[in-house]
């Protein structure tokens, strides 16, 4: 409540079929669309039935940070929302935001609120699939299972190579960014964060709701701008 998440719903296969029931449970007053793809006509109709003000988050949307990314129109809304979500929790702080999802992204915002950009790397499932699909004989290995220091068969060699490789990659980014920002604090989010949140040295915060927090902050910020404009 307030700025804290109350509930969540996940809908697969590009459908919003469960949204009506969710809206009946929680009567929304306003909303924000942060989709990284274009919505289908069916999705647009479903959202229209909510009959609430809906902000579409685009590269033109006012945001409470300074976006220094050189190609803002190509910047994924989820990346920017993650930055804003972390910044809303730790304002005035140098931050590294690591989002371990389909891809793993590394974003940096400084204590003055300047977002400088970040890097994108293959996520866990993408790495596991690539080893299977781009080789002749390597199997598709599940992420769940033993992760020894050195693999003792092909399955553990692949799993350890991927998961430990990502762990060392994350730790390397933290070390590199802390050399530039000595007081840097780190957030880890994303669906695959649970594979790393207890194993990463110098990891400060984990929060599964960083992106929704950012979208909520953007929505509130635009409401504040509208209210102030009406008072002027």
What are these regions, as identified by a protein language model?
Residues 98:
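Divalent metal-binding pocket/active-site signature
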């Amino acid at each position: 409540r307030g700025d804290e998440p109350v509930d969540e719903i996940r809908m697969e296969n590009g459908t919003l079929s469960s949204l009506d029931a969710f809206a009946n449970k929680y009567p929304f007053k306003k909303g924000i669309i942060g989709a990284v793809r274009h919505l289908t006509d069916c999705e647009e109709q479903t959202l229209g039935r909510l009959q609430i003000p809906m902000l579409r988050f685009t590269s033109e949307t006012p945001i409470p940070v300074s976006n220094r990314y050189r190609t803002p129109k190509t910047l994924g809304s989820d990346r920017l929302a993650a930055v804003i979500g972390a910044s809303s929790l730790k304002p005035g702080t140098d931050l590294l935001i690591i989002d371990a999802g389909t891809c793993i992204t590394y974003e940096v915002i400084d204590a003055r609120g300047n977002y400088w950009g970040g890097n994108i790397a293959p996520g866990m499932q993408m790495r596991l699939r690539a080893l299977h699909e781009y080789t002749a004989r390597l199997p598709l290995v599940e992420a769940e299972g033993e992760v020894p220091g050195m693999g003792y068969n092909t399955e553990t060699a692949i799993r350890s190579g991927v998961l430990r490789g990502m762990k060392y990659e994350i730790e390397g980014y933290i070390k590199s960014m802390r050399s530039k920002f000595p007081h840097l604090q780190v957030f880890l989010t994303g669906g695959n964060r649970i594979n790393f949140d207890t194993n990463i040295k110098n990891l400060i915060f984990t929060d599964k709701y960083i992106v929704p927090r950012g979208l909520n902050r953007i929505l509130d910020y635009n409401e504040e701008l509208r209210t102030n404009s009406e008072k002027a």
